């Protein structure tokens, strides 16, 4: 799946791209913009020892940029742009963040530095879910996702965690500056 602009899938079940029991696929040079869920991946990759490769895509202004709903892993995500999404990535299973490979992606909310000016952040990008676990585990609570109560709960959870946050992803070499998509 290459060189597409996918946008405005905003209904209750709106999904830009959906993978169900898919294997050995390439998703490259696409723009997934303004969707309820940019990419939904369920039991994908399905076949053992295969991968789904996401490369040079832009995920912008989605409710959830990528939602993985299985614990299989096997996705490789490199050189993608994540900007302006309410939530960049959701892993529905517990303890599965290390089963997908992340490398060289740009995250608009990365808070690290690039002291040696090589274009790569000095510290890994790690995304944790704190109060988000409420709506991840109880999907009907997603209606309240940006409400003041859940935002306050998320702030308090980060300040003084009363439960262990769940790691959603770890990119050991995040891009520090947003790459130019026209090149």
Regions from the PLM with identified roles:
Residues 1-3, 24-28, 49-56, 72-79, ...:
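All-beta strand scaffolds that present successive hydrophobic residues in beta-strands
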Residues 4, 9, 30, 35, ...:
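Consensus "Asn ladder" position of solenoid repeat domains
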Residues 72-183:
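Acidic, glycine- and Ser/Thr-rich low-complexity intrinsically disordered tracts
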Residues 8-14, 47-50:
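Short coil-to-beta transitions that initiate beta-strands within beta-rich domains
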Residues 32, 44-46:
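Short polar/acidic secondary-structure junctions
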Residues 52, 60-61, 65-67, 74, ...:
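Membrane-proximal low-complexity regions enriched in glycine and acidic/polar residues
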Residues 10-17, 36-42, 63-69, 86-92, ...:
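Short glycine/acidic-rich loop motifs that flank beta-strands on beta-rich extracellular proteins
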């Amino acid at each position: 799946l290459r060189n597409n602009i996918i946008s405005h899938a905003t209904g209750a079940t709106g999904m830009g791209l959906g993978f169900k029991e898919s294997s050995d696929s390439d998703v490259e040079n696409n723009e997934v913009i303004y969707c309820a869920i940019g990419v939904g991946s369920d039991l994908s990759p399905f076949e053992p020892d295969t991968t789904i490769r996401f490369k040079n895509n832009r995920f912008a202004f989605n409710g959830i940029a990528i939602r993985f709903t299985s614990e299989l892993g096997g996705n490789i995500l490199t050189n993608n742009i994540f900007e302006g999404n309410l939530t960049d990535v959701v892993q529905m299973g517990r303890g599965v963040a290390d089963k997908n490979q992340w490398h060289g992606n740009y995250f608009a909310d990365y808070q690290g530095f690039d002291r040696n000016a090589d274009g790569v952040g000095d510290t890994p990008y790690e995304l944790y879910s704190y109060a988000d676990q409420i709506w991840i585990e109880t999907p009907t609570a997603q209606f309240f996702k940006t409400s003041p109560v859940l935002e306050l709960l998320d702030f308090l959870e980060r300040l003084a965690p009363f439960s262990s946050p769940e790691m959603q992803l770890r990119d050991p070499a995040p891009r520090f500056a947003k790459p130019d998509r026209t090149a």
